[in-house]
Amino acid sequence: MLYQAELSRHERFLLRVYKKRFWFKEVKISISGIRGVYGKDFFPEDVIKFCNGFSKLIKTGKCAIGMDTRETGEMIQKLVSATMLERGIDVYNLGITPTPVVFRKAREIGAGIVITSSHNPLEWNGLKFIIDGRGITLDELEIVKNGKNLDKKDIGKEIISDSNYISDAVKIIGKLNKPQQVTIDIGGGAAKTIAPKLLQEIGCQVETINDELDGCSRGPDPTSNELTELVSKTKDLGFAFDLDSDRVILVMNGGKKSSDITLGLGVVKAIKLGIK
């Protein structure tokens, strides 16, 4: 599909009028990811184009792929995998998994793609690109956007991959001296595959709420919700995640803590553990 940079001034004006008239939403393209309403302003051809462009950045010939729990995730995942395989990239399929798990795997094998629109509304979806365990730069984004004129490659292979995230995290965190009663608001997202088991492994007594997206009592973004159910059920500690589990809100002492406090606590703990 055409992007505004490729249009004349008159054509861009007509496009703005069309969007205003028909409430057309434009796909968001940034180093944080490609995001849009799948099937309305974000299409299969976009997925193929951006993944083709991203393949130019992959030097190891390997790419981890994970996704959150959105309804369109599996459809996009198959398209992403097929595109990578066609480009000669070996695909490590992590299935439904938190974004940090994909980042860690990408650091190990060289690249990763997360199919997510993070905390955006459920009808949205998108692609987050990772190189060597980090997000892409502005220069790399320009390469991702130019998914044309690619040489033919041998077909890559697909590997259903497990993650050592939980076992490695337990080694870093260690076991708790005193068991904690923890309530986790999954938010219907990917946290369900990691958070409960990890907390149990370090010695917590865990209760979960909103395990599935269907019937979830709140929206995708825990920072914009009062988290009333979580607050009422939390005894020692509570955690609320967004759909791809790269946002977390802490509940303690009968109330929801701000995201700034949550981040600060995480940074302090990381420094104490010597994590960089």
Where are these regions (language model features)?
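N-terminal small/polar loop signature for handling phosphorylated ligands or for N-terminal nucleophile
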Residues: C63-W124, K197-V251
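Proline/glycine-rich low-complexity loops and linkers
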Residues: L85, E142-S167, M252-K276
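Gly/Ser/Thr-enriched, mixed-charge loops and adjacent short helices
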Residues: E123-K233
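Short beta-strand-to-turn element immediately C-terminal to the catalytic PLP-Schiff-base lysine
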Residues: F129-D132, I249-N253
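An N-terminal, well-structured beta->alpha segment
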Residues: F22-G88, I109, G156-V182
